[in-house]
Amino acid sequence: RIYVNGQQVGMTKVSKTPAEFNVTNYLKEGENLLAVQIYRWHDGSYMEDQDFWRLTGIERDVFLQAYPKLTIWDFFLKSSLDSIYKNGIFNATVDLREFTGNNVKKGTLKLELLDKTGKIVLSQQKKFDIEDEFTQLAFSGVIKNVSKWNAEKPSLYDCVITLWDDKNKQLAVTACKTGFRKIEIK
């Protein structure tokens, strides 16, 4: 169970999986108290009977994170190779999320892929209109003569995603690494 300032915000019975709660309505000006109550066993424990240590407690970080009213909520990158294993095939989907009170209804989302020297090998921008709580944008491209990822030479690219409003004000930016490889059984 999760409590903020003495009020229960939510609960989860799933261990080993992240849990997220919107605590906005429970916060106050100044210092706030975040408390977590952990039970050793619950009615679904038998379903989690897998091959791992059955330890109780917090195993990962617990933190509060503030987001703007419109933000990059999630993204998925798929980096593969063409049929001759020479060029990279890149696909990405980016989810934007609108929170209560958002006034930004239009903007631009930019995705850039940079090689290890910092050279931009793919750059795309998409305009968007916010109509629902979630908006998804898709990107795709081919990277010629891609530097492939493998265990001996783990070549990675940086993917940078930037969100701007319609007045060109930067709202959010996130980045991660991706590698191009293809695994198959023929």
Locate each region found by the language model.
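Secreted/periplasmic carbohydrate-active enzymes, especially glycoside hydrolases
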Residues: 1-186
